């Protein structure tokens, strides 16, 4: 099942290399290796595959490549076993392209897709890794501690520094984002406050 992954990797590479902010933050890796992993399905995979609100002007190819590969992905459940409820676990979508439980590995980067349906809240959380979001389709409000809220749509960029608490929320539109990490890959995100709902 190489074909959807190879197409997705090449499409992500093209988008990443063309975006100076992404390249400055974390250059697209040159040490990529294939790796074996087991697919793992969650309901968010079906939601993303059937989503009709992921509108984009510039990133349709990458959006579609993430959707095409999603039936074969290992969907993450980062917050399982926390105070996060079933709604979040069933509707928040994230799977890896580069990193653990992903089709490719690199020593310098982690890369995922994140999907959230409309009217969805991703609670405040933080992690040692530095992070950058590129909004591919739809829109969301991004919040960072001690910063004004920012509503971003397709093409918008958001950077989170190490251990900076941040959250996201969608309203009338869903969102899909290409997300990369640099440095400090070993620690998973943790909830900052007990505000999950």
What feature does the model see in each segment?
Residues 5-9, 171-197:
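Double-stranded beta-helix
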Residues 105-106, 122-127, 144, 169:
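Short histidine-centered beta-strand/loop micro-motifs
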Residues 113-119, 126-142:
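Short, conserved beta-strand element in jelly-roll/cupin
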